A protein has these predicted regions:
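Transmembrane helical bundles and short interhelical boundary loops of multi-pass, membrane-embedded
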Residues: 148, 163, 175, 195-218
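Short acidic/glycine- and proline-prone juxtamembrane loop motifs at membrane-interface regions
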Residues: 11-17
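Transmembrane and membrane-interface helices of multi-pass
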Residues: 1-5
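Transmembrane-embedded, aromatic-rich helix segments that form part
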Residues: 38-41, 51-61
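Membrane-interface transmembrane helices that cradle and orient dolichyl/undecaprenyl
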Residues: 23-36
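Hydrophobic/aromatic-rich transmembrane helices and adjacent perimembrane loops
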Residues: 166-182
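Alpha-helical transmembrane segments and terminal signal-anchor/GPI-anchor hydrophobic tails
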Residues: 56-168, 214-216
């Protein structure tokens, strides 16, 4: 489903999708603690689309599993910031240093109110991850992918009032896929979890085809 969605977007947001693919190669350098290789890969991704620079702070997230309580506090804080509209200042700061004032203004003006879809998406993924938190290993690779996946949810909540907020989260999707693969490979043994996940899969498939099929037209 994720790759299918990215396939649709490739026809409309080609440069950014290329950047997303390249940025995904940078995750291994986080848990290998190779800063310069990480930066180089992110900069290459940014050469296709400047928004890839949002990945740079991820390297400095400590490689450890945080408590569920700490994660919930962070997510609530991100939601409050997003609802307040204060996150738009991030776009403004980026604008002043990148010379993209006109494009950034378009991002800021593209606020269509509270994005319920972002909230539902973030809550659903958080529920799956946190409900199966103990199943996620403690090796560096899984922890890094976990933290990047949680960052994906945080980004959705931070930019919950922006139509373009979801696009910033694309750079974290590959880590989310990796984390969900680990979680669902064990949790699907539970019948209830299996029914819920399959129901969501069918719903998202229909939503993607009906909602994004138009993006097949350049």
């Amino acid at each position: 489903l994720f790759f299918g969605l990215l396939f649709f977007f490739t026809f409309t947001y080609l440069r950014q999708m290329i950047g997303v693919g390249i940025a995904g190669l940078s995750f291994k350098f986080i848990y290998e603690r190779k800063l310069w290789k990480f930066v180089i890969v992110v900069l290459i991704a940014a050469s296709f689309h400047n928004s890839a620079l949002i990945l740079l702070p991820v390297y400095f997230i400590p490689i450890k599993k945080y408590s569920i309580g700490a994660i919930m506090v962070l997510m609530i804080l991100c939601l409050l910031i997003g609802v307040s509209g204060a996150s738009s200042s991030l776009f403004e700061a980026y604008s002043s240093t990148s010379g993209l004032e006109e494009r950034t203004t378009q991002y800021l003006e593209d606020t269509s109110g509270f994005r319920v879809a972002y909230l539902l998406e973030a809550v659903f993924f958080l529920w799956i991850i946190l409900a199966n938190y103990s199943k996620i290993g403690k090796d560096k690779q899984q922890i890094v992918l976990l933290n990047v996946a949680l960052t994906f949810c945080a980004i959705l909540l931070l930019f919950i009032r922006s139509e373009n907020g979801g696009r910033l989260g694309w750079y974290f999707v590959l880590a989310l896929i990796g984390t969900l693969t680990v979680v669902l490979s064990t949790s699907l043994k539970n019948v209830l979890n299996k029914l819920i996940v399959y129901a969501v899969v069918v719903f998202l498939y229909v939503r993607i085809v009906l909602g994004c099929g138009v993006l097949l037209t350049p």
